[in-house]
């Protein structure tokens, strides 16, 4: 009930106000009642308002309690109570009005524990109603006392406070919050109300409250302190008090050095690390640590500078120094060195003399140990770009990475007559004229060359080259051995065999010309030509044998200069088992070479004899009715008289075949021979494109003069190549013997039959078949040289192949192949078959 309601009802209802102070621990006494007004004289509204402004409000709050001095202030409460109507609820007090003017006096006192004590006339009220009313008023009183601020007693009650006996005062007092009030309300000495929180989340207490148990037990008011601490703690959780602010402040102060979730742990290292010393303050221990760390870095980098075994390491070896980045640790270690030198120079004479040698050696080692980083000028940087090479790419890019040769060699190749030197280069897979320069730079890749073959590091057999076992003299001799074998072998093309006369074809055609003239009356010319031919054949055979004999002993390789690995490869190439002794390998290779050179000399003569026998046998079958005449002196010694007679008859009767009027049957039988020669020469023109011009017979001479016919057929402006001779021999022999297997199948068989060689120094030597499976680009010249020297010998194949045939085989099988060197566009397509 507020003041307006009291004012409106004060005229009709007499009020009795009384204050009863009660001390905790003492029974209440009705004698301590001071009535402010008499019931006989009710106050007027003006006096009531004046008394309300000076006295406390009608409701009470928690008394001022400090833990030691527990003083309960009784607060006068004005109530308007109906006489004989029980109060059933707080809302009925406003609605119900009493008709009788008789009033009752009720004194209500609030104690700390929340109990109520009513002192007054209880005779006019029933006990049941009173107790029931009091139970309902408990909740109302609790709610009203919880949220209001009570005023302190006025000056009229000061005398009453003096009469109240004071209890023992405790030290732990709760101060009154009245300092921040206004001047007008400072006399009231109000206690600050608890602030409400808008969000009902209790504040977490970081600091744990510490309670001294001994002090509580020693103090007489310890029980009250603990009791008030429990109530205050519950209420402070829902209000903004100073305890929460101080707890936040103590948290930041107490945990200043502790790590938090948002502070990285690495920052704590800076608190323990001492300050960076200046160069003048640096000690010898720092220098020792710097040198030790430097040595550790050098040791860590040393294993990377081992033997270069890959293409990438070979290619990037010369760029390693330029690609090194700046070492910041090294720059920091250089700074303390300069003051140390000054200290050495400023030392006394005795100390300087004793440590001068060590100091000097250490400085020299430090200066020469690591190269000084130098910034390259722009012009030099651009020049270095020009020197760089394209290292990786497709097979077409690899094909362009040919070794660099001098320009004079290419000019000599272009200016040679009928470009025969270009043809001979196929038989010699490596350059011999520039052995001292190109072997070290372009083939082995040890002097920083700029081609791809040096980076691949392949040896003469096409296997991976071993860089630590290089012998330039032995390698050059190995090249010369391959070159001489290719030159001296009758199947290969070379400069010594370039200008030889074909004994089998040219004299026969001369004989045909002369015998035709003899049939017309000039018989003496036939005998003269036969004599000339007999004289010519021994000379030519002697010349060929001399060239073979001269070619073999001069080019005998010096096996003593070969390395052990090369000797083992040579022994394995001949089909022998590995030999441990170096001397035994050298002696075995010399014997093998001697026997091979002898077989090469002897093979040249039987080949000529067999070719003549094949031709004569072909002519004998076609012409059985001819006279016997000796062929030549050299062939007469080896053959039986029957073969000599048959050959002589065929040679003597051949000119008659060219006269169609006299003998038409012989003309018809001879036409296939003419057509076969014509077709073969025409094929040589298409395949070799050497530039041969042969004028063929447009029509036969019906007058019987066949000289013009033979002259036109033999009008060849350029010498016939060995390929043409081989093709003639093959065509003539193929018609009477079983055709041999194709070269493609023989190449496949030879490559698959190559045995696996031993690994030298832990490096495996792959075979040709393994290289093909690994998609390693196959060099056509190397594979052709291996097939002619070793591959075909394992499978019993006598023929030989050139790079052109090998290229056709590679393209048919899908093998990646490249040319080792490019001499001209036409030479790549020259097939070489024997």
Swiss-Prot record:
Phosphorylated in response to DNA damage. One of its GO terms (biological process) is DNA repair. It comes from the Eukaryota. One of its GO terms (molecular function) is 5'-flap endonuclease activity. Residues 729-740 have a biased composition (Low complexity). Pfam families: Slx4 (PF09494). The keyword Transmembrane does not apply. Keywords: DNA damage, DNA recombination, DNA repair, Nucleus, Phosphoprotein. It is found in: Nucleus. Its main location: nucleus. Residues 279-295, 345-366, 412-421 have a biased composition (Polar residues). Residues 611-630 have a biased composition (Basic and acidic residues). Residues 296-305 have a biased composition (Basic residues). InterPro entries: Slx4_ascomycetes, Structure-sp_endonuc_su_Slx4. The keyword Nucleus applies. GO terms for cellular component: Slx1-Slx4 complex. Belongs to the SLX4 family. Forms a heterodimer with SLX1. HAMAP family: Endonuc_su_Slx4 (MF_03110). Regulatory subunit of the SLX1-SLX4 structure-specific endonuclease that resolves DNA secondary structures generated during DNA repair and recombination. Has endonuclease activity towards branched DNA substrates, introducing single-strand cuts in duplex DNA close to junctions with ss-DNA. This is Structure-specific endonuclease subunit SLX4. It comes from Ajellomyces capsulatus (strain NAm1 / WU24). The lineage of its organism: Eukaryota, Fungi, Dikarya, Ascomycota, Pezizomycotina.
